[in-house]
Structures are given as structure tokens and as C-alpha cells.
């Protein structure tokens, strides 16, 4: 199988076949640790990877939520375009949202401080795309985005404070 969009189709289809045979192979349970780095800065660790959120010159946590969502859909569209053999010249996702920080700064009896609205736009340059391929990619964005799905549902959360 060929390489499309710098990805090996064979690798993608092989993983898909593996998951079809055993759905537990699709399970993920990542744990990240955020460390305070002074002022409003955090250093995030996941295994041997590190990212910085907040502080001078970095995305703040709420911007990072949008960034993670946009990046997730870039990955999703690129992967599915590859699987259907569609060459992508360029791809970007623009995400924006509204939130209010009254509750975050400690004002009482105010609505939650999370996003209450998010909009996003996929900008795809794939001159050979058919209308069926575009419809398929739109469907994947609407139904298969892990972060989009997370944002759209009530997620069970547990909390400890030590």
C-alpha cells in the first residue's frame, strides 16, 4: 500500500483490523501531571514528553483546550484522508469559543467558567477530493473526533485534594 500524506496506509489499515478483532486494543488511559512553574505557568508531563501551558509566551489553559480540539481534528482529517487515498495539500482547523471567568476568579453565584460555546472550521485544500470524500470527512469530524466527543458529552470525573 502507498504512502499518502506522509502516512503509510498499510499501518493505518493494519491497526484498524487489529481493533476490529479486539476492541480492547483501542482503549487508552493516559495520565498527565501538571506542575506549577510559578505565576500562571504549568509544566505538563506525560511519560517522556513535556509541554508548557500558561505563563509568558505560552497558550493559557483555555486556549490550549481549543488548540487540542483543533489539532485533534487536523489529525483526524489527515488520517482519514490518507485511508481513502486523498492527497492533502494543506489542512487547518480554526476553533474559537466563549467562556466567562467570573466563577474562576471567585465571584459567587456565577455560571461555570468553562466554554459555553465553541465553533470550528476545517479548511482543506485537496483539489482531487470528490463530494463523497468530503462528505465522509465531515462525518468523521462530527462523529469520530475524540476531543470533540469529549467536549460534547458529560464526562464522569473523580476528584481528590491532597
Segments and roles (model prediction):
Residues 1-67, 79-162:
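Extended beta-strand/beta-hairpin segments
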